[in-house]
Amino acid sequence: MALNQRFLNKVVIVTGAAQGIGRGVALQVANEGAQVVLADLSDYVDETLAEIKAKQGDAITVKANLETFAGAQAVVEKALEVYGRIDVLINNVGGAIWMKPFEEFSEEEIIKEVNRSLFPTLWCCRAVLPEMIKNQK
């Protein structure tokens, strides 16, 4: 258990929790006492869950396409079903699909990049906002 318990008994949604920064953030907030909702489309999110559980942490996974509002709503609904509230949303999902100079991107590739990196943040904020306003978070 970490000395810093700033997330003790807080329900925290972490998007993009399967890999990279999102995985690291999820592990850290769990280590600091959070009840973590691990949101990702990838099956690798199960590995993040297993690591948290191995350290006696409290977490669930929600596999959802966060490029859609329905996917974001599914994450919020599951968090509320299991934990009854949401205290913190950490929007992390996104990242480059193609690594090349921007001038080489086609219009379709730019649209896919925006869909992957911008819309998940917007949809998750929109989905969680009514609950956070209600609970003055």
Segments (PLM) and residue ranges:
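Hydrophobic positions on the long internal alpha-helix
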Residues: 75, 90, 120, 124-128
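Conserved catalytic-site loops of classical short-chain dehydrogenases/reductases
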Residues: 87-88, 111
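Catalytic Tyr-X3-Lys loop
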Residues: 103-123, 137
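Conserved NAD(P)H cofactor-binding loop of Rossmann-fold oxidoreductase domains
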Residues: 93-98
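A short helix-coil junction within the Rossmann-fold of NAD(P)-dependent oxidoreductases
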Residues: 32, 82-83, 100, 127-136
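Active-site loop of short-chain dehydrogenase/reductase
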Residues: 10, 57-58, 85-86, 132-137
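Canonical Rossmann dinucleotide-binding motif of NAD(H)/NADP(H)-dependent dehydrogenases/reductases
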Residues: 5-37
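The beta1-alpha1 cofactor-binding region of Rossmann-like NAD(H)/NADP(H)-dependent oxidoreductases
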Residues: 63-75, 107
